[in-house]
Regions:
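Short, solvent-exposed beta-alpha or beta-beta edge segments that form flexible loop/patches at the rim
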Residues: 50-78
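Extended, positively charged loop/linker patches that create polyanion-binding surfaces
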Residues: 89-121
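Mixed-charge, glycine-accented linear interaction segment located at domain edges/termini
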Residues: 129-185
Length: 185
């Protein structure tokens, strides 16, 4: 088994969302509970986890740092969704901004409100090793510019900010007896 992991999306489902507060699955090899709805495929750019910490240096009278305290911490994931579906659009702009009637989906792209908080989950596979990263409380806080061009997939790239005390969690299960990573199945 290799300590170097590849962040390859699972071919049978990569990105899921569920109501805010839904518990994250505890075993990456088990079936995803039905409370989680599949959002769609993530592009080959993969997901990007970013953490940010703001600190304050406490100094004594001689201007020597005596203590460093964290004043702010944030975690975000950017996930370029390459599926343009009713479910992916509900995730990006909020369910209230997506309607469907007679097979026609209409999306309000101009709403100035953020979508409601949800739970989010991404599933990855590297050979027989499985990983998930997710949060029980997160919110789409931004969406990158969307290009509509011939010969290229339309990617909806939300930035999801983890909220509350839990933040994002990485859950990993390594295959027993594996000798190395072989790529996605």
């Amino acid at each position: 088994m290799s300590e170097v992991k590849l962040g390859l999306g699972l071919s049978t489902g990569m990105f899921y969302h569920a109501p805010k507060g839904t518990a994250l699955p505890t075993d990456p090899t088990a079936a995803i509970p039905s409370t989680w709805k599949e959002v769609g495929d993530v592009s080959d750019a993969g997901i990007t986890l970013a953490t940010s910490k703001t600190v304050t240096n406490l100094r004594n009278w001689a201007n020597a740092i005596k203590r460093v305290i964290m004043t702010e911490h944030s975690e975000t994931i950017q996930a370029p969704i390459m599926d343009t579906t009713e479910e992916s659009l509900k995730t990006v702009v909020g369910e209230a901004n997506v309607s469907k009637a007679n097979g026609v989906v209409t999306v309000n792209l101009s709403d100035g409100e953020l979508p409601p908080e949800e739970a989010f989950l991404w599933v990855m596979k590297d050979g027989d090793d499985m990983m998930m990263i997710g949060c029980t409380q997160g919110q789409v806080s931004a969406v990158d510019n969307v290009s509509f061009a011939p010969g290229a997939a339309i990617n909806w790239t939300p930035t999801i900010t983890a909220m509350g005390d839990d933040g994002f969690k990485l859950i990993m299960k390594e295959a027993t007896g594996a000798t190395g990573a072989t790529g996605a199945s």
